């Protein structure tokens, strides 16, 4: 936020103050030096999503999200979604500053996927709680929201999930991707093909099911041994 204000606020005094505060922060956290506002928001989202203590230690103790709407207000969040919602908020900020930030868009797809899976996993025990149910209802269309991000974004999100061992998000994305597949040719390094050889059996199974739904095995330039999916 300081980087954003230091570059874009109309008041020069505010810009100068923000730049000074940003300089002090980057002197302490040197890995943030030279990064633009969108990059910094993305990095914050990545740290939240990874559960990094570096950012969790500074998170608000109450399980609420703060926002500005004719004054400072807050919104309660279920405990199981709190860190994911912080990550989501930062990813949206990254896209607000720079709508072409493809890495932020891909991370957002993974965040929404993880929110949906986490909520579904707790539905049997938490269902009936008013706050939980309100968020569960809001996530009912999560697959459609993720699908609307398009094939390039989902491909990048799947690749990032495989690289980081984010198995739950990978399985969710593989379930959604057949809905937006446009018939593009696959290559051996495409994340869908890579998923068929992932160390996790659940991801391999999700990839196998996705390939069946693509109904386009002939387009694969290199098709792995199907007997290897569950080994």
Name each region found by the language model.
Residues 1-4, 15-24, 139-148, 160, ...:
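Structural detector for internal amphipathic alpha-helices that build alpha-solenoid repeat scaffolds
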Residues 1-5, 154-159, 189-193, 226-231:
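Buried hydrophobic core positions in alpha-solenoid tandem helical repeats
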Residues 4, 8, 24-28, 47-54, ...:
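Positions within ordered alpha-helical repeat solenoids
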Residues 10-11, 165-166, 199-200:
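Short inter-helical turns and helix N-cap capping residues of alpha-solenoid HEAT/ARM repeat scaffolds
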Residues 15-26, 39, 103-129, 144, ...:
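TPR/TPR-like alpha-solenoid helical repeat scaffolds
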Residues 31, 36-39, 43-93, 114-148, ...:
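Short coil/linker segments at helix-helix boundaries
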Residues 38, 102-103, 167-170:
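Helix-start (N-cap) detector for alpha-helical repeat units in TPR-like alpha-solenoids
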Residues 99-103, 200:
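Residue-level recognition of tetratricopeptide repeat
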